[in-house]
From Swiss-Prot:
It catalyses: RNA(n+1) + phosphate = RNA(n) + a ribonucleoside 5'-diphosphate. Residues 739-778 have a biased composition (Basic and acidic residues). This is Polyribonucleotide nucleotidyltransferase. Keywords: Cytoplasm, Magnesium, Metal-binding, Nucleotidyltransferase, RNA-binding, Transferase.
């Protein structure tokens, strides 16, 4: 497909990146998926995404939330590939697809009219993938456009762009190749305001794995000031994307339909609840402890239902919703007017912090991090690189060495619930913590291990994801991982409202769960002492001024320094690796020797692993990683590998205590070194006695002392048996060496002497199994066919 045939109507957004060129994003509609309420094809380069928005006919009155669903369908044909699964078709969504769903949902959800209860589904299908252009940001814009066309009560359009900081400049929609040179990668979504400004609605950002190296080479570190400048730099691109979407909507959008809106409560219910319980709620919100505070609020709720139930019969849900709204109002008012939070802290105060490492036995690394009632256990496991995760997605990455898993069991909030496979929220939190630490991880060469980090949220009252960042840093250092710098994270909140005719914003440091629920923003920031490594912004507003976000970044920086001090008091440098962790040794061999180390059908490498107890992983460039839980096993495996691929070549006259590995009619093959065999001819086997059958003297597995008699031009080795002193010379050559058809009769045997020093030329038999100097016997007469 090309841009010209993707739809009947189309509009284009052109974004100028100066020296980095222009990016053209095209929105087309009217040809594909015409039965959906709204559909659009968005294209960037050769990346093509189809977005279809549909809406349920009947509202779900029983729901007390907006039933919006976003699905991303990664089609492997988009990259010209067949799925690697058993059934050769796409199955459950990949982690990349789930994270893209969350990227789309976060700016989209607050843009719908409040109280909408009709089911809305947005399905994104990746039809074609340009290796240079990721599909995720294209999908956000496509979702906004298809929803704008659908006739739903939607306040969009929403524009989204990826911004990369490259050579001191911010580049919109960078290619994969350009991202290799970036110190910071940021996805920003927002909407254009009537005054021409842009309100930021969502941010997902991280430093790259190359950041530390690039900064050491002179690039600008992604400090709070640099990140804030990136938010400003994203505005022109967002404005242009919103313009193109608005123009297409003017000619192709359906009229906005009337949908029933279900308010949580009516004004009379709210007024009755406020008159009865406002003072009690205000007192309850002064209780610092979460459990005690919630218990007091539950008592107030029970009294409200009891006292007002008869008056509002059948409307008990309204009373509960009104009480929640009253609680939210009191929390926000107290912060805005008195600068006092639920637990009595000021806007910049952090809850009590504790950090401890080495809390579990036997595991490779462990740590416990607590911030108030939020408690995270971090556990680190190290293994061979062959245990890294293989990826079968549309992403250009095919494996992942660092894996971060986040678990949020129901008991962490004192509740019951389902325990099992991770939900989208858990996948998203784990990915955020993973991205926060990737920039400070050692390279494969510096630390040749696969690393799995697990964060167990044992207690939750605000920002378990940022607690996971702190616990992970501690756990990794406890396991002996040489991080380039420790990383800490903090969650920031926002309360905003009209106060004396002006909009006032108060940024909160280290938010509680209730402040997250009642506030306007969840802004998570992670980083080192020097720069930001990851951040994530979710908002319930239509947008937040960028200067407010810039101030929040600076406030987060101050909090991060405090947390890092507590963490460094627990552990300052990487600890000694656990006795239970594998020790990995690196061996470099010539690429053409890889096959020798592996052996036929893996026999050689399997034998080394079985006999030494070590694990061996071989890279395509000839790097071999040898891992074992004890030093002698690893050293034995390294010596075996070196003997094969980096050997000290044997010389004529060298003696070995070898092992018989194969017998034939003409002699025995003796293993001298791993991968190095020699032929002990039948005439040399019997210590001067005539030998009719090799097996009468030697069998597979027998040990025999031999001396190298000759090495021919092809490297094949011929052996003499080392005989005890005074023993007779070897028997005459085997009968198979005599010309056929001659009868010796009773003639005395002819003394042929010892032929060990005779030039053998290329007569050495070939074993045929890849070993040195081996093979089957051959007839003397050969016919050459031309």
């Amino acid at each position: 497909m090309t841009e010209s045939n993707l739809g009947a109507q189309s509009r284009t957004a052109t974004i100028d990146n100066g020296a980095f060129g222009t990016r053209v994003i095209t929105f087309s509609t009217g040809r594909l998926a015409r039965q959906a309420a709204g559909s659009v094809v968005a294209q960037l380069g050769e990346t093509v995404v189809l977005s279809a928005t549909t809406v349920g006919r009947q509202p779900k009155e029983q729901f007390d939330f907006f039933p919006l669903t976003v699905d991303v369908e990664e089609r492997m044909y988009a990259a010209g590939r067949i799925p690697g699964s058993f059934f050769r078709r796409e199955g459950r969504p990949s982690e990349d697809a789930i994270l893209t769903c969350r990227l789309i949902d976060r700016p989209l959800r607050p843009s719908f009219v409040k109280g909408l209860r009709n089911e809305v589904q947005v399905v994104e299908t990746v039809l074609a993938l340009d290796p240079s252009h990721p599909y995720d940001v294209v999908a956000i814009n496509a979702a906004s456009m298809s929803t704008k066309l659908s006739g739903l009560p939607f306040s969009g359009p929403i524009g989204a762009t990826r911004m990369a900081h490259i050579d001191g400049s911010w580049v919109a929609f960078p290619t994969h190749e350009e991202l290799e040179r970036a110190t910071f990668d940021m996805v920003v979504a927002g909407r254009a305001l009537p005054d021409g400004d842009v309100a930021i609605m969502m941010v997902e950002a991280e430093a790259t794995e190359h950041t530390v190296k690039l900064v050491a080479g002179g690039a600008s570190a992604p400090t709070e000031e640099v990140v804030a400048s990136g938010l400003e730099a994203a505005k022109p691109a967002i404005r242009e994307l919103c313009r193109a979407q608005s123009e297409l909507a003017e000619v192709a959008a359906k009229p906005v339909a009337e949908f029933p809106v279900f308010l949580d409560y009516s004004d009379d219910a709210y007024q009755a609840v406020a008159d009865l319980a406002r003072s009690d709620v205000a007192e309850a919100l002064k209780i610092a402890g979460k459990a005690d505070r919630e218990e007091a609020l539950d008592r107030i709720k029970a009294r409200v239902i009891e006292d007002l139930g008869p008056r509002f019969e059948g409307r008990e849900k309204e009373l509960s919703a009104a009480l929640r709204s009253l609680t939210k109002s009191e929390v926000r008012s107290r912060v805005l007017r008195e600068q006092v939070r639920i637990d009595g802290r000021g806007p910049r105060d952090i809850r009590p912090l504790t950090a401890e490492v080495g809390v579990l036995p036997r595991v490779h690394g462990s740590a416990l991090f607590e911030r108030g009632e939020t408690q995270i256990l971090g556990v680190t496991t190290l293994n061979m690189l062959r245990m890294e995760q293989s990826l079968d997605t549309l992403s250009p990455e095919k494996s992942k060495r660092y894996m971060h898993n986040y678990n949020f069991p129901p008991y962490s909030t004192g509740e019951t619930g389902r325990v099992g496979s991770p939900k989208r929220r858990e996948i998203g939190h784990g990915a955020l913590a993973e991205r926060a630490l990737i920039p400070v991880l050692p390279s494969r060469e510096e630390f040749p291990y696969a690393i799995r980090q697990v964060s167990e949220a044992l207690g939750s009252n605000g920002s378990t994801s940022m607690g996971s960042v702190c616990a992970s840093t501690l756990g990794l250092l406890s396991a002996g991982v040489p991080l380039k710098a420790p990383v800490a994270g903090i969650a920031m909140g926002l309360i905003s409202d009209e106060v004396e005719g002006k909009t006032r914003y108060v940024t909160l440091t280290d938010i509680l769960g209730a402040e997250d629920a009642f506030g306007d923003m969840d802004f998570k920031v992670a980083g080192t002492q020097e720069f930001v490594t990851a951040l994530q912004l979710d908002t319930k507003l239509d947008g937040i001024p960028s200067d407010v976000l810039a101030a929040a970044l600076q406030q987060a920086y101050e909090a991060r320094q405090t947390i890092l001090e507590v963490m460094q008091a627990a552990i300052e440098a990487p600890a000694t690796m656990s006795d239970y962790a594998p020790r990995v040794t690196t061996v470099k061999i010539p690429v053409d020797k890889i096959g020798m180390v592996i052996g036929p059908k893996g026999q050689t490498i399997n034998a080394i692993q079985d006999e030494t107890g070590a694990e061996i992983s071989i890279e395509d460039d000839g790097t071999i990683y040898v891992g074992a839980t004890n030093g002698p096993s690893a050293q034995a495996a390294v010596e075996r590998v070196n003997a094969i691929a980096n050997p000290t070549l044997p010389k004529v006259g060298d003696r070995f205590l070898g092992t018989v590995v194969k017998t034939a009619a003409f002699g025995a093959f003796v293993s001298l070194l791993p991968g190095r065999d020699g032929l002990l001819h039948i005439s040399k086997v019997g210590d001067g006695k005539r030998v009719e059958k090799v097996e009468d003297y030697l069998n597979v597995g027998d040990k025999v002392e031999v001396e190298i008699a000759d090495i021919d031009q092809r490297g094949k080795i011929y052996l003499d048996k080392v005989r005890p002193e005074g023993a007779e010379g070897p028997a005459e050559a085997a009968a198979t060496d005599r010309p056929a058809g001659r009868d010796r009769g009773d003639r005395a045997p002819r003394d042929r002497g010892d032929r060990g020093d005779r030039e053998r030329g290329s007569r050495g038999p070939d074993r045929g199994d890849g070993g040195e100097g081996g093979g089957e016997s051959r007839p003397r007469r050969r016919t050459r066919h031309s």
